[in-house]
């Protein structure tokens, strides 16, 4: 049975107990949230993934994407990126490999980590199709579903599937005033397949079969936003909302079948529309966990899109988003390297912290309180311990010497906290 089915039967699983303990939440409250579809625990029955809860009343989680491309493929490089994202606190990882060695890379990632692993199966189906000297849109239904079955058996915990890309959705794009059309790689591949074959999307037409596969292995569905806006001009348009309403119906079918499900959200959204997008999604999709890419709140900062995404993600998380997909400085420019991965994870961790302050998560509030106390006490070691990136904080602090170890080089003798404390001490004497 799936975690959702156990929860609905009133049974508390070891996975629920683990999540409740790590989140410091009542396990019965957690069970009810899982039973209602507001929380998922992406954990395939075939692996030893650490149970990680995503959704209502829990810490905001972050995902980091790695993986090869047809232009750059090196297993060791991808594993080095994995080490970095684990070091800086990613809660999940997605392997988005599209190169010939994608099987080897996924297995290496699975063998090296126990955090939830996600994929986009249609990438592998496309690679398999082109390896047979066919064009990618000639992939048949069997390859798509065979790929999903094989990945489920291998222990993939959650899969992004673009079930909302339908013939009607493509018409909505044609009827819209979009500047950039379809920018999701999986969404574009699916749309091209539909147009080439003049048939409905197999993942939509055979959704019940997809649910059977996921139910057998307790693979969590992540319903992809194939029509997400690729620029702020296209945000919250009819095509995006048309797909979202389809996903809302699919959420209900998934939950009815006992399959865990979350929904992916928009990519580029002006800051004035972020909160509304979260509210629309939560309403249409029955409060299923929301997994957002950013959203990026401006289009003119290439090289700094980890910052534009963190701004949007902070608002999104504070407004109800549950799962943040990191964005690196390399977004829109190149395949990310190790430093890009580091910067992307840290930026997303900051956004998650900001989100959890808004959600008043008790352990987050305690961490913020403890940091204030440490600063007031000039307890530098404690500050480094509590910091999201204590390594960098320590490096900056130690980069310059001061006459008094309590002070940093910014203010020196003009340190506001020390000045008041010294006068208070003198007055007492």
Swiss-Prot record:
Cofactors (names): [4Fe-4S] cluster
Keyword Hydrolase annotated: no
Gene source species: Methanosphaera stadtmanae (strain ATCC 43021 / DSM 3091 / JCM 11832 / MCB-3)
Name of this protein: Phosphomethylpyrimidine synthase 1
Key word 4Fe-4S present: yes
Keywords in alphabetical order: 4Fe-4S, Iron, Iron-sulfur, Lyase, Metal-binding, S-adenosyl-L-methionine, Thiamine biosynthesis, Zinc
Recorded name of the encoding gene: thiC1
EC main group: lyase
InterPro entries reported for this sequence: ThiC, ThiC/Bza_core_dom, ThiC/BzaA/B
GO molecular function: 4 iron, 4 sulfur cluster binding; carbon-carbon lyase activity; zinc ion binding
């Amino acid at each position: 049975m799936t975690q959702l089915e156990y929860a609905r039967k009133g049974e508390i699983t070891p996975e629920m107990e683990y999540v409740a303990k790590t989140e410091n939440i009542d396990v019965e409250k957690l069970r009810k949230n899982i039973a209602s579809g507001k929380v998922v625990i992406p954990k395939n029955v075939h692996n030893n993934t650490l149970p990680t809860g995503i959704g209502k009343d829990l810490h905001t989680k972050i995902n980091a994407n790695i993986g090869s491309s047809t232009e750059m493929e090196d297993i060791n490089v991808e594993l080095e990126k994995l080490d970095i994202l684990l070091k800086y606190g990613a809660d999940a990882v997605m392997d988005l490999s599209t190169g010939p060695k994608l099987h080897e890379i996924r297995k290496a990632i699975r063998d090296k980590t126990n955090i939830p692993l996600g994929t986009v199966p249609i990438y592998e189906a496309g690679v398999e199709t082109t390896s047979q000297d066919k064009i990618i849109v000639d992939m048949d239904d069997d390859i798509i579903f065979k790929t999903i079955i094989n990945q489920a058996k291998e222990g993939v915990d959650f899969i992004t599937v673009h079930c909302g890309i339908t013939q009607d959705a493509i018409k909505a794009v044609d009827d819209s005033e979009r500047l950039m059309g379809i920018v999701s790689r999986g969404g574009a591949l699916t749309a091209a397949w539909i147009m080439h074959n003049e048939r409905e999307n197999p993942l939509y037409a055979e959704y019940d079969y997809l649910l059977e596969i996921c139910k057998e292995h307790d693979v969590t569905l992540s319903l992809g936003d194939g029509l997400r806006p690729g620029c702020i001009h296209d945000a919250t348009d009819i095509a995006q909302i048309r797909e979202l309403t389809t996903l809302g119906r699919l959420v209900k079918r998934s939950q009815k079948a006992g399959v865990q499900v979350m929904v992916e959200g928009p990519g580029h959204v002006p800051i004035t529309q972020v909160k509304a997008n979260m509210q629309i999604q939560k309403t249409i999709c029955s409060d299923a966990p929301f997994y957002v890419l950013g959203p990026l709140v401006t289009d003119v900062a290439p090289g700094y899109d980890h910052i534009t995404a963190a701004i949007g993600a902070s608002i999104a998380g504070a407004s109800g988003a549950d799962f943040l997909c990191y964005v690196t400085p390399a977004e829109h420019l190149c395949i990310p390297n190790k430093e890009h991965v580091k910067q992307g994870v840290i930026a997303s961790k900051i956004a998650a912290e900001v989100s959890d302050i808004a959600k008043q998560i008790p352990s987050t509030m305690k961490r913020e309180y403890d940091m204030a106390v440490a600063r007031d006490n000039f307890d530098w070691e404690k500050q480094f311990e509590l910091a999201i990136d204590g390594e960098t904080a320590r490096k900056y602090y130690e980069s310059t010497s001061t006459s008094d170890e309590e002070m940093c080089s910014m203010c020196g003798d003009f340190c506001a906290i020390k000045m008041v404390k010294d006068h208070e001490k003198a007055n007492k004497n």
